[in-house]
Amino acid sequence: ERETRELLLETADILGADHIKIGNINGYPREVGDIRRKFADISDEFAQVDTQVGLEFFPVDPNINTIADAMEITEGIDNGGLYLDLWHNVKMDIDFNEIANLSSGDVVGAEFQDGYIDTNMSFIEETINLRKIPGEGEFPISDWISATRESGFDEPFALEILSEEYRRLSIEVAYQKAHDGGSQFL
């Protein structure tokens, strides 16, 4: 873990990264106090290279089920905050009003895509193969963008498109489709 963190610190410094995101994609159960301490330590380390740390939370994480759970970990920690991902927010049935009620500075990064509310696929299969170009699914993208902006987040939004069909496109076509799909919601 230490070696990986050092590599990420060096990379963030070289690239001048605005932020990184971390989370519990493997779904390990942990005590909230332990997670908060670790998040604070990582945030302090990355402050040395002027890179914010965002906590991304997932449906498979048994420690975070709500915005309030996530805020219990990040609130009051300098150089850290939430990293919102529409995909996970929809799959976790996060109330967008809770996002809108966050304070300026609570969110350090945000990414979106489109997808389907319900499928018969496993979490992993759906996550890597059904994150669609915005406008090609049924996610309430405009509502989520509005809520995220209402929270005071005024940084650029990222796209995270992971789908089998998207990976088959040429780079030129993929970039254009991503740009056109994403920009219609911003």
Regions inferred by a protein language model and the residue ranges of each:
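Active-site acidic/histidine proton-transfer and metal-coordination neighborhood
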Residues: 1-81
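Soluble or luminal CAZymes and related metallo-dependent hydrolases
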Residues: 3-4, 34, 38, 136-140, ...
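Amphipathic alpha-helical segments that form well-ordered structural scaffolds
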Residues: 11, 41, 143, 147, ...
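Conserved, mostly hydrophobic/aromatic
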Residues: 12, 53, 85, 110, ...
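Hydrophobic faces of well-ordered beta-strands that scaffold small-molecule active sites
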Residues: 20-22, 53-55, 80-84, 108-112, ...
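Gly/Pro-rich active-site loop or hairpin
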Residues: 32, 64-71, 88-154, 163, ...
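Conserved hydrophobic residues forming the short capping helix/wall of the S-adenosyl-L-methionine
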Residues: 46, 74-77, 148, 182, ...
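C-terminal helical cap(s) of enzyme catalytic domains, especially alpha/beta-barrels
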Residues: 168-186
